[in-house]
């Protein structure tokens, strides 16, 4: 009986020693993985913040204010899901249209906004219909790069929307593992590609909702 007690007492000891030997290495691996995940998440949030700078400020502000209201803080039914889809469509259309707007400085230093056309620029709020006091508006005509910027703006908005918790909870309340994986990867991939394309095709217009610098006459 005493031999059995000694055997039972001595048997778990090597296992505890092995666990004590393995635990530090495993904990280091886990800590390393956690740190890598935290860095990846930080880079993702940073890229998302940089992506938001490529969108019109008014559209982005409307998205941030209206999304919690339309989605009921992420808890959607059929009606709120439909209304949220309509909201996203309108905001994406706003990003698209804003890419075809620009600003011009008159002789008196006042900045006016307008829409670019194939022939030039249509200034909306300029008091003189003849355009006296404005630079040559034909230089502001629509170009092919404007269509690229408009498409990229819509893609960037989609990437930002898919990274929003209210949107994902509304349209994907209980996503499967593959769906969740796609929702984590696709916005980041689209954001990186759009950022690279914006570097290749830089935006030179200062349209409605975008930052206007001191030198508007840049052409």
From Swiss-Prot:
Residues that span the membrane, as ranges: 51-71, 82-102, 142-162, 182-202
Principal subcellular localisation of the protein: endoplasmic reticulum
Domain of life the protein comes from: Eukaryota
Keyword Endoplasmic reticulum: yes
Cellular component, GO annotation: endoplasmic reticulum; endoplasmic reticulum membrane
Region ranges (Disordered): 1-24
GO biological process, one term: endomembrane system organization
Membrane topology recorded in Swiss-Prot or TrEMBL: Multi-pass membrane protein
UniProt-listed Pfam families: DUF679
Keyword Ion transport: no
InterPro entries linked: DMP
Alphabetically ordered keywords of this record: Endoplasmic reticulum, Membrane, Transmembrane, Transmembrane helix
Localization in the cell: Endoplasmic reticulum membrane
Family of the protein in this entry: Belongs to the plant DMP1 protein family.
Described function: Involved in membrane remodeling.
PANTHER family: PROTEIN DMP3, PROTEIN DMP5
Name of this chain's protein: Protein DMP5
Gene: DMP5
């Amino acid at each position: 009986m005493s031999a059995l007690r000694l055997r039972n007492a001595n048997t778990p000891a090597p296992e505890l020693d092995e666990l004590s030997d393995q635990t530090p290495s495993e904990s280091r691996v886990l800590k390393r993985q956690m740190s890598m995940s935290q860095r990846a998440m930080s880079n993702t949030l940073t890229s998302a913040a940089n992506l938001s700078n490529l969108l019109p400020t008014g559209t982005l502000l409307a998205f941030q204010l209206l999304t919690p209201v339309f989605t009921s803080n992420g808890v959607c039914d059929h009606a709120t899901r439909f209304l949220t889809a309509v909201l996203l469509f309108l905001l994406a259309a706003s990003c698209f249209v804003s890419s075809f707007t620009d600003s011009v400085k008159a002789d008196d230093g006042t900045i006016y906004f307008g829409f670019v056309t194939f022939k030039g620029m249509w200034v909306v709020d300029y008091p003189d219909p003849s355009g006296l006091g404005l630079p040559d508006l034909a230089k502001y005509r629509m170009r092919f790069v404007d269509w690229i910027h408009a498409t990229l703006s819509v893609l960037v908005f989609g990437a930002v929307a898919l990274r929003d918790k209210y949107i994902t909870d509304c349209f994907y309340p209980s996503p499967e593992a593959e769906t969740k994986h796609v929702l984590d990867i696709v916005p980041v991939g689209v954001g990186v590609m759009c950022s690279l394309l914006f570097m290749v095709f830089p935006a030179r217009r200062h349209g409605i909702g975008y930052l206007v610098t001191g030198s508007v006459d840049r052409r």
